[in-house]
């Protein structure tokens, strides 16, 4: 993550889930010795309105500002009750929620998205906000899930492939686990298609035990690099012959956080990210952290 004075930012919408997210973010900020910034996005004001519409809009905006103040006050009080010594600030903006959080990520350690429970019907809407933030934010992003108001004692589960984003996910997972005294379970998905290096195209001709052993050895070696930086963390590696989303879901039931990587920064990247992350966002009982690889030049992946 980043320096100790960088804040943890949490976006709230006034729902019970958002209040829990604020408390969870407060617990994380307190453990990292970082300040907490609670933000709320108000709808933007319409333009070129008739006099009647303008009057109605002004009244509605006044009501929404009052509600925003109430949301922020409730979140501030709940967080301070949990962590009396924590530095907490609140702010609201008349901008789209995703842009508010993307801008806030520029100097943040972590951005937490609090809101209503995600359903399959809400996937596309959520994709336009949470995944927009995740693929464009300058820091890791957590989509809050579950009912907990602080990280528990379950392991941090992290999805690992051979991408730079997976390295970022591993480092974030180990740092989080180290701060909270948790274990790390690294999970790699194993495709059941014939690996190119075998030179054959028929899966039945593949020594899958050998493939799995090789993948496990490679994953363990990758995990060990990060484990050496955080020697107090107990780390285990797992190979799952399933899709990435399903492979991770096999391990999240008793975990406290699941961490995945985002491979890109553009609209297409959001779609690619969604196939795994949206599955987790629909079904994960715990918060989901999405990490981007460190920028490499100006080109999109």
Where in the sequence are the language-model features?
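Structural beta-alpha unit
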Residues: 1-4, 17, 59-62, 77-111, ...
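Small/aliphatic-rich secondary-structure junction motif
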Residues: 2-58, 154-206, 227-230, 234-235, ...
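Short glycine/serine/threonine/alanine-rich loop segments
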Residues: 33-35, 86, 139, 182-183, ...
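Short beta-strand elements of ligand-binding domains
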Residues: 112-115, 141-146, 288-292
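General small-molecule cofactor/ligand-binding pocket signal
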Residues: 37-39, 89-93, 142, 185-187, ...
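Short, structured interface segments
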Residues: 130-148
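A short acidic, glycine-rich active-site loop
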Residues: 57-70, 205-215
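Glycine-rich, Arg-bearing micro-motifs that act as flexible, cationic patches
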Residues: 113-132, 153, 257-283
């Amino acid at each position: 993550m980043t320096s100790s004075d960088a804040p943890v930012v949490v976006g709230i919408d006034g729902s019970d889930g958002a209040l829990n997210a604020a408390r969870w973010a407060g617990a994380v900020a307190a453990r990292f010795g970082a300040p907490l910034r609670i933000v709320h996005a108000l709808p933007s004001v319409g333009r070129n309105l008739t006099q009647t519409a303008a009057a109605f809009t002004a009244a509605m905006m006044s009501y929404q500002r009052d509600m925003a103040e109430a949301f922020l006050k409730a979140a501030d009080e709940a967080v301070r009750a949990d962590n009396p010594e924590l530095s907490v600030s609140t702010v609201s903006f008349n901008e789209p929620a995703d842009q508010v959080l993307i801008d806030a990520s520029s100097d943040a350690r972590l951005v937490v998205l609090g809101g209503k429970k995600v359903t399959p019907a809400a996937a596309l809407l959520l994709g336009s906000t949470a995944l927009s933030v995740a693929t464009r934010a300058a820091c890791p992003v957590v989509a809050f899930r579950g009912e907990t108001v602080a990280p528990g004692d379950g392991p941090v589960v992290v999805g690992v492939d051979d991408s730079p984003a997976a390295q970022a996910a591993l480092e974030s997972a180990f740092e989080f686990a180290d701060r909270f005294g948790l274990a790390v379970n690294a999970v790699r998905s194993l495709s059941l298609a014939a690996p190119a290096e075998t030179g054959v195209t028929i899966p039945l001709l593949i020594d899958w035990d050998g493939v799995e052993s090789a993948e496990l050895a490679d994953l363990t070696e990758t995990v060990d690099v990060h484990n050496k930086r955080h020697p107090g963390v107990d780390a285990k590696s797992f190979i799952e012959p399933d899709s990435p989303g399903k492979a991770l879901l096999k391990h999240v039931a008793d975990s406290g956080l699941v961490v995945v990587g985002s491979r890109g920064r553009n609209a297409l990247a959001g779609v690619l990210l969604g196939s795994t992350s949206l599955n987790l966002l629909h079904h994960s009982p715990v918060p989901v952290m999405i990490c981007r690889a460190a920028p490499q030049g100006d080109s999109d992946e």
